[in-house]
A protein has these predicted regions:
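Long, contiguous binding/interaction regions
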Residues: 1-139
Length: 139
């Protein structure tokens, strides 16, 4: 490991506090508002799917809101909306984040809902691909 790694230690010596430097470099309040909007939108959908049988959908019992095509659509939109956050979030340590920071809650919601939608969404893709194979074979 020592042949491939360099280790540095830095110390901020003057002119501003870490909090002030963070405020100059990132719009954390704006990012936090976008995280909160993401949570508001997707937590309602996640709860709705849980109430109407998301766990049943994972077991193969599809209710209207958890049909494979709908799960694929929801998962696609969820990923599309969330994917900008990892590029924008500086992943600062807790003491440098605003009080009530919603970034971690948004990440947990994304991971939980994304995983819950996986089974039915992936079945939908497999079914569509199989149908395409049948069409090609018949041509």
């Amino acid at each position: 490991l020592a042949r491939n790694v360099e280790i540095f230690r830095g110390e901020h010596l003057a002119h501003s506090s870490p909090e002030r430097l963070v405020a100059q470099c990132w719009d954390l309040a704006g990012l936090d508002r976008r995280y909160a909007a993401f949570i508001a939108r997707w937590s309602r959908e996640f709860e709705h799917c849980n109430q109407c049988g998301m766990t049943g959908a994972r077991a193969g019992i599809h209710k209207p809101c958890t049909a494979p095509a709908d799960c694929f659509r929801r998962r696609f939109l969820l990923v599309h909306e969330y994917r900008a956050f990892p590029l924008e979030d500086p992943l600062l340590p807790g003491p440098l984040l605003p009080a009530g920071w919603t970034g971690k809650a948004a990440a947990r919601l994304f991971e939980t809902y994304h995983d819950a939608l996986a089974g039915p969404a992936e079945r939908f893709v497999a079914d569509v691909c199989a149908e395409g194979d049948e069409i090609v074979a018949a041509a």
